[in-house]
């Protein structure tokens, strides 16, 4: 049985939000000017519907404390995912996790978290995207679309045309990641991305709310104009 059938068991509100996502916030305390909690608050206030807590420099206790506050900020307004750390996601009852190709297999993550939780998987090509969908991923993060310095092991950018190839191959949402900013985000959406991540462009700015809102406006304008 295709594990995608487990998707309808997810909370209706969260699955509804997953289908409506536009800009996708990934936190980075190392790059942030104002701090992770401030970034999340401003992005969600601007209309961001999905937040991934990505933290590599804090203790487990510190992460749980911070994740608990992020969950409170997101509330009913945004999906709250934890990057990699299933233990932290379980501790705070996050809406799900985002994992990579070398992390825990989706099937095991589903067993630990339960079928109602959302799982996103990083993929780099059509083959990995198809496998992710077969194994029950709720969405894929495709990249790196452009060269990026945010993630050291991201490799060379695969280009926005790769988004269309993956989008045509699977039915679950495709989130574009890697090196995306306001100068290059338009072809990302035009090639079919449901959403995209722009870490540096947002958390390094002086006004996270303004930058988030601008990205949301760009995405919605392209989608509403039929340019996808």
UniProtKB/Swiss-Prot annotation:
2-[(2R,5Z)-2-carboxy-4-methylthiazol-5(2H)-ylidene]ethyl phosphate binds at residues 148-150, 179, 199-200. InterPro entries: Aldolase_TIM, ThiamineP_synth_sf, ThiamineP_synth_TenI, TMP_synthase. Mg(2+) binds at residues 84, 103. Keywords: Magnesium, Metal-binding, Thiamine biosynthesis, Transferase. The keyword Manganese does not apply. Binds 1 Mg(2+) ion per subunit. One of its GO terms (biological process) is thiamine diphosphate biosynthetic process. Gene3D superfamilies: Aldolase class I. Pathway: Cofactor biosynthesis; thiamine diphosphate biosynthesis; thiamine phosphate from 4-amino-2-methyl-5-diphosphomethylpyrimidine and 4-methyl-5-(2-phosphoethyl)-thiazole: step 1/1. It catalyses: 2-[(2R,5Z)-2-carboxy-4-methylthiazol-5(2H)-ylidene]ethyl phosphate + 4-amino-2-methyl-5-(diphosphooxymethyl)pyrimidine + 2 H(+) = thiamine phosphate + CO2 + diphosphate; 2-(2-carboxy-4-methylthiazol-5-yl)ethyl phosphate + 4-amino-2-methyl-5-(diphosphooxymethyl)pyrimidine + 2 H(+) = thiamine phosphate + CO2 + diphosphate; 4-methyl-5-(2-phosphooxyethyl)-thiazole + 4-amino-2-methyl-5-(diphosphooxymethyl)pyrimidine + H(+) = thiamine phosphate + diphosphate. It holds the Pfam family TMP-TENI. Belongs to the thiamine-phosphate synthase family. Condenses 4-methyl-5-(beta-hydroxyethyl)thiazole monophosphate (THZ-P) and 2-methyl-4-amino-5-hydroxymethyl pyrimidine pyrophosphate (HMP-PP) to form thiamine monophosphate (TMP). This is Thiamine-phosphate synthase.
């Amino acid at each position: 049985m295709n594990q995608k059938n487990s998707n309808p068991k997810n909370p209706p509100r969260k699955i509804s939000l997953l289908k409506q996502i536009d800009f996708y916030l990934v936190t980075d305390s190392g790059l942030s000017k104002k701090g992770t909690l401030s970034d999340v608050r401003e992005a969600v206030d601007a209309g961001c519907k999905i937040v991934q807590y990505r933290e590599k420099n804090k203790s487990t206790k510190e992460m749980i404390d911070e994740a608990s506050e992020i969950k409170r900020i997101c509330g009913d307004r945004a999906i709250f995912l934890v990057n990699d750390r299933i233990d932290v996601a379980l501790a705070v009852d996050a809406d799900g996790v985002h994992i990579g190709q070398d992390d825990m297999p989706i099937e095991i993550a589903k067993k630990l978290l339960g079928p109602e939780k959302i799982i996103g998987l990083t993929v780099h090509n059509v083959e990995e995207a198809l496998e992710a969908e077969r194994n029950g991923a709720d969405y894929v993060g495709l990249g790196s679309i452009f060269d990026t310095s945010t993630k050291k092991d991201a490799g060379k950018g695969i280009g926005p045309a790769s988004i269309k190839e993956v989008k045509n191959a699977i039915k679950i949402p495709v989130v574009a990641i890697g090196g995306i900013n306001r100068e290059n985000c338009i072809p990302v959406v035009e090639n079919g991305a449901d959403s995209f991540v722009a870490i540096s462009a947002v958390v390094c700015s002086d006004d996270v709310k303004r930058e988030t809102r601008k990205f949301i406006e760009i995405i919605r304008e392209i989608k509403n104009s039929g340019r996808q």
